[in-house]
């Protein structure tokens, strides 16, 4: 993330009255990966939680890597992320307490309907990326260490490829999120890896089509991590515990997640995945 944006974010959290975690009370600060914000699920959860519990949640959006960096400064109470390796590192270094499963959706590989690389219908993302690389067809990456970028790089690794060359374009504004990245990809007639929720939210505004989907490697797990109060005493631990309990409840947020997007898109944008939800469905 650019240095000036870091400064703006820190000013928002530290200098503006009413937005400091140090004030405690009925207020939770959340640093969230951008995709769930763009889809509307974060706002829907925040609004219903405030109605149910009278506790306000406010968020700042950033790629997972940047969101975790904000939390490492102690400027938020909770993080919503989707990059397991970065999340585990964050916890191991003492910044967060635990990785709590919340929900999941999936990534898809999108590209022009004409499909110059010939990947449509391939069963695995690895096969598709090999063909894109092998044909030198334009591919756009966020390149910002966000959860989406980390997932993309894991897929390249599974394919045994280190992407580089004129065909592999790192979008200079990738840190702004998946929607701008998807629009840029569309303008270039290129391929990219994107979460399905983002694609569905603007599919009527772009020409790109979903070409590869359904590979287990494309699943996108989203979790929440409470920031460690032992490291940052000003963290609003009490209200975070209430929020996490509500988020993971099969009778509360998990039902909202289950149904979110059905009316508009004909299918949900996310699937509930808390331990409590899985247990209630007969899982382990």
Where does each model-flagged region fall?
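Positively charged n-region of N-terminal signal peptides that target proteins for export
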Residues: 1-4
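Bacterial N-terminal signal peptides
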Residues: 7-17
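Exported/periplasmic ABC-transporter solute-binding proteins
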Residues: 21-52, 56, 65, 69, ...
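Short glycine-biased active-site loop of nucleotidyltransferases that positions the nucleotide triphosphate
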Residues: 71-72, 100
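Acidic, polar ligand-binding/catalytic clefts
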Residues: 78-104
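Residue-level signal for tight coil/turn positions that link beta-strands
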Residues: 104-106, 136
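Serine endopeptidase catalytic core focused on the charge-relay Asp
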Residues: 109
């Amino acid at each position: 993330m650019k240095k000036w944006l870091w400064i703006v974010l820190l000013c928002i959290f530290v200098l503006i009255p009413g937005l400091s975690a140090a004030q405690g009370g009925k207020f939770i600060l959340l640093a969230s990966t951008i995709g769930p914000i763009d889809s509307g699920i974060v706002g829907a959860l925040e609004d219903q939680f405030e109605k149910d519990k009278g506790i306000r949640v406010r968020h700042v959006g950033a790629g997972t890597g940047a969101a975790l960096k904000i939390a490492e400064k102690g400027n938020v109470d909770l993080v919503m992320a989707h990059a397991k390796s970065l999340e585990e590192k964050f916890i191991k270094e003492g910044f967060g307490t635990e990785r709590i499963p919340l929900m999941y959706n999936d990534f898809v590989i999108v590209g022009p309907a004409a499909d110059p690389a010939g990947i449509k219908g391939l069963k695995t993302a690895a096969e598709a990326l090999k063909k894109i690389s092998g044909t030198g067809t334009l591919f756009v990456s966020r390149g910002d260490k966000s959860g989406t970028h980390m997932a993309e790089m894991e897929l390249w690794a599974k394919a045994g490829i280190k992407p580089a060359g004129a065909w592999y374009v790192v979008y200079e504004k990738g840190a702004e999120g998946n929607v701008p990245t998807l629009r840029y990809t569309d303008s270039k007639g290129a391929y990219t890896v994107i979460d399905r929720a983002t694609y569905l939210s603007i599919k009527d505004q772009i020409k790109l089509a979903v070409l590869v989907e359904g590979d287990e490697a494309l699943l996108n797990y989203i979790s929440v991590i409470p920031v460690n109060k032992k490291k940052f005493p000003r963290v609003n631990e009490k209200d975070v515990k209430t929020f996490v309990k509500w988020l993971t409840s099969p009778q509360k947020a998990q039902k909202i997640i289950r149904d979110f997007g059905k009316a508009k898109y004909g299918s949900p944008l996310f699937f509930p995945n808390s331990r409590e939800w899985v247990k209630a469905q007969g899982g382990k």
